[in-house]
Amino acid sequence: MGNIQYLAAIPSPPQGVWHLGPVPIRAYALCIIVGIFVAMKIGSVRYQQRGGNPDLVIDAGIVAVIAGIIGGRLYHVLTDNQKYFCADCNPVDVFKITNGGLGIWGAVALGTIAVYFYLKKKGVAFALFADAVAPGIILAQAIGRLGNWFNQELYGRETSVPWALEIYYRVDASGKFAPLTGHSTGEVMATVHPTFLYEMIWNLVIFAVLLWADKKFQLGHGRVFALYVAGYTAGRFVVENMRADDATMVFGLRINVIVSVVVCAIAVGALFALRRGRESISS
């Protein structure tokens, strides 16, 4: 990338991993953990307000987290398989999820499916539950995007805008290039669009919209969840087109762009097709 001088820019963290003795403390993992707790707390409060048992959110949340991690990693590995199964790659890296690489599509899809069957076994209505937890999920996604900032990943094309993000050259203790686990040398490799920040801000906007729309229109029967999916995928479509990292291409488009369009269309259709009004826990 070019050696362009910028008047202002957003610095990346000098590192994304700290060590407590032999134990690595990864910012990416911490952001995900904080997001999970925030989502569970908000979901518990909202589900209780709808007449549900808040403890169920915690139980279902554990199911969702386990399934989400598996689904997210599977989606990432399948759609970015060239990063793990090439001549110079180490397939063992597939299991190093703390280094980053959780596809949100796979996480939400498998997490949702797992929770659906868990609630069905418990005899609990899925739609009411999904509406209660949807705002917390999008807020958790916003928090999780901070992990990409620490990892210096998922950024956009080079730019000279004042809010551009500086990507530092990081090395490990031996001086080898280590973008995820190393420490910054102070050298700026590139100044790019902070797409992680764009998506984080968009997710915060959707969080506010969900709370507002839910209160104003008394949404129910799965419509809050549908609005969440539609809102998130619309923003992801825009952000995905700004990213510069390697991606699997289908018909000349990034695969996540195609997924965004398809899922958004389904969610919008569901939003208008689902029943109006809000159901009670006993209905």
UniProtKB/Swiss-Prot annotation:
It is a multi-pass membrane protein. One of its GO terms (biological process) is lipoprotein biosynthetic process. It is found in: Cell membrane. Keywords: Cell membrane, Membrane, Transferase, Transmembrane, Transmembrane helix. InterPro entries: Lgt. Its EC number is 2.5.1.145. One of its GO terms (molecular function) is phosphatidylglycerol-prolipoprotein diacylglyceryl transferase activity. It comes from the Bacteria. Pfam families: LGT. The keyword Transmembrane helix applies. Coiled coil: none annotated. Pathway: Protein modification; lipoprotein biosynthesis (diacylglyceryl transfer). GO terms for cellular component: plasma membrane. The chain crosses the membrane at residues 20-40, 51-71, 97-117, 123-143, 192-212, 255-275. A 1,2-diacyl-sn-glycero-3-phospho-(1'-sn-glycerol) binds at residue 145. Catalyzes the transfer of the diacylglyceryl group from phosphatidylglycerol to the sulfhydryl group of the N-terminal cysteine of a prolipoprotein, the first step in the formation of mature lipoproteins. Belongs to the Lgt family. This is Phosphatidylglycerol--prolipoprotein diacylglyceryl transferase. It comes from Corynebacterium diphtheriae (strain ATCC 700971 / NCTC 13129 / Biotype gravis). The lineage of its organism: Bacteria, Bacillati, Actinomycetota, Actinomycetes, Mycobacteriales. The gene is lgt.
